[in-house]
Amino acid sequence: MPALSAFTIVVFAITYILMFALQKYRPYIAVTSAAIFVLVGSMGLFSEFRYGILDALKEIDWNVLMMIAGTMGTVYLFIESGMPKLMSDVLVSRLHSVKLLVVVLSLFAGIISAFVDNVATVLMVAPVAIALCKDLKISPVPAIVCISISSNLQGAATLVGDTTSILLAKAANLDFTDFFFVEGRPGMFWVTEAGALVSIFIILFKMRKETASVYLNQRTVVKDMVPTALLLLTVITLILTSFIPYKDHAMPGEFYKPDISNGLICLFYFAVGAIWTVVKNKNWDSVKGAIKEIDYYTLVLLAGLFVIIGGVTQAGLIEKIGDLIAGIGGSGSRMSVFLIYTLIVWMSVFFSAFIDNIPYTATMLPVVAVVTNQLSQAGGLDIHPNLLYFGLLVGATLGGNITPIGASANIAGLGLLRKEGHEVGTKEFMSYSVPFTLAAVITGYVLVWLIWM
């Protein structure tokens, strides 16, 4: 094994082992590991590995960080207005079962996530669940974990729901409607929704001990409707701008949006809310509270993870794994295709549980194209590229649900719980995520094969 690959594997493995074992220190561990990659890359200890500070800064997804900060600020004003409490009251008045309430909130988060970034979805829906759990005097952990996982799951339902979907659409030449039906066959939307429906039974099973029925005698009065309007405008603006391509995905001469557009949108509406609050209350107290409540723990952790994954990708480790897949095309028989398809799906689940699925998907897409071509030529089968493309998306998108650090939405959800005084361990998180993910992935795995082979 080359020295660079060995170094990358060792540092990467130690980093994630420590983050699992020392959960309170995850940001420090992530930043330290990121610094090691940058230091080694800057010193030129490996001739083929150049990874300086500027390279690391480019790997950080500032769009995501700005979006989290801006949305958290607006959400704080939203919570202070009393609207989440009122929404909780309305839900309780209509659905008296705790289990059904969690299911409805999870499905609601999933629906929004099909059109809005997963992290933003969690930050918008979670406060309602937290307010509800406070009313019922129960732990918000199951509800928030289910909301986070559900938002990750349904992000793959549409072209605009997740970055991995955008990458796939470019590689497979798909447009917005192709995620619903393509060439007369069901697209990823229906595969994802089928997985979501199956996962409902997992939520009901995990919540089976919550048998209480709840009733309310009065409803909360909302103090200010402006934060609610700003949050709705945030969602609407994110949806509308999602139809505008980024520079890398735009055609020559086509108008495109900047890479940090979503982050700027979220920060803009928070700024409007902050100005409105100062004018209305004639003091800075609420704005100071909003800035203080931004989850800097999550922001630092994500920044560190982005740099780490950038280093792993720069070292060529992910690409080497992809090359290995491309080299085992086999005979091109139906069984060979099935084995390759199975390998791509479940390998994607495994790796996306520990690393960000965006660089992984970007690396694997050209590999999938090569593998499809090799299999078709070897066995003479007419293999549709969407078989492996959609299989990759099923594995890469849903796999991030398994671990707390496998997806930004999970990290954001756990950050909100931490703010409420609830530290969620890896074991507790995975008691929900593993059965949920397996149910959704197996459903998608079977459906994609039946539809496209």
Regions found by a protein language model. Name each.
Residues 1-80, 86, 182-323, 428-453:
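Hydrophobic transmembrane alpha-helices of multi-pass small-molecule transporters
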Residues 20-24, 80, 95-96, 135-137, ...:
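Helix-loop interface residues and adjacent transmembrane-helix termini in multi-pass membrane transporters
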Residues 50-141, 298-380:
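Membrane-embedded alpha-helical segments and adjacent helix-loop junctions characteristic
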Residues 99-104, 134-147, 176-187, 334-335, ...:
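Membrane-interface alpha-helices at helix entry/exit sites of multi-pass transporters
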Residues 113-124, 140-178, 196-200, 349-365, ...:
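Alpha-helical transmembrane segments and, especially, the helix-loop junctions at the ends
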Residues 169-182, 317, 325-329:
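Juxtamembrane/interfacial segments at transmembrane-helix boundaries in multi-pass membrane proteins
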Residues 183-197, 263, 338-353, 384, ...:
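Hydrophobic alpha-helical transmembrane segments
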